Curated annotation (Swiss-Prot):
One of its GO terms (molecular function) is manganese ion binding. It is found in: Cytoplasm. Endonuclease that specifically degrades the RNA of RNA-DNA hybrids. Keywords: Cytoplasm, Endonuclease, Hydrolase, Manganese, Metal-binding, Nuclease. The keyword Kinase does not apply. This is Ribonuclease HII. The gene is rnhB. GO terms for cellular component: cytoplasm; ribonuclease H2 complex. It holds the Pfam family RNase_HII. It comes from Pseudoalteromonas translucida (strain TAC 125). Transmembrane segments: none annotated. Belongs to the RNase HII family. Residues 9-198 form the RNase H type-2 domain.
Length: 200
């Protein structure tokens, strides 16, 4: 599938990581690539090995014209809901770019609030280089944060499942309860909190 690109110089790509996990921030990245510094091997971050993602993230940071991260905390996710929090995090990423883009490609089927023209592209992380780069930066940043959280709370196994709802994560929630980084509005976490209060 060929994506029609607008005839402007500054195009940003935006993607998110972390809508599904029960813990931690939803993390987004916005990237404007430098056409004079091509990056080989850009692809959907989910299709790359961790080692390849880490290497590409460094290369993107070195070669991109500019990049920025946007995030929403578990508290914001609980207040807004995950969809609205994701949109807000995307807006924050674009607003954080040191050079503002003339056009923005967003991964997915919804557009966040932006001051410039934008287009949402389903599976954009496989179709648009700027979105691929953003997906890699966001994934590496969030995964690294989960590794750090794992050091503080090793009993939950965050370094392995990255906060996603796995059997191991459910078991740890049942055994140890929720930590402050857990998203209290997500049903599995609500269930554990209710049990702890003796309501379930």
């Amino acid at each position: 599938m060929q994506i029609e690109r607008p005839n402007v110089a500054l195009i940003a790509g935006v993607d998110e990581v972390g809508r599904g996990p029960l813990v931690g921030d939803v993390v987004t990245a916005a990237v404007i690539l430098d056409p004079s510094k091509p990056i080989a091997g850009l692809a959907d971050s989910k299709k790359l090995t961790d080692k390849k993602r880490q290497a590409l993230a460094i290369e993107i940071q070195e070669k991109a014209l500019c990049y920025a991260y946007g995030r929403c905390s578990p508290t914001e996710i609980d207040e807004l809901n995950i969809l609205h929090a994701t949109m807000l995090a995307m807006t924050r990423a674009v607003e954080g770019l040191s050079t503002q883009p003339e056009f923005v490609f967003i991964d997915g089927n919804r557009l966040p609030k932006l001051t410039m023209p934008a287009q949402a592209i389903v599976k954009g992380d496989s179709l648009v280089a700027e979105i691929s780069a953003a997906s890699i930066l966001a994934k590496v940043a969030r995964d690294n944060e989960m590794v750090e959280l794992d050091k503080r709370h090793p009993e939950y196994g965050f370094a392995g499942h990255k906060g996603y709802p796995t059997k191991a994560h459910f078991a740890a929630l049942e055994q140890y309860g929720a930590i402050k980084e857990h998203r209290k509005s997500f049903k599995p976490v609500q269930r554990v909190l209710a049990q702890a209060k003796g309501e379930a």
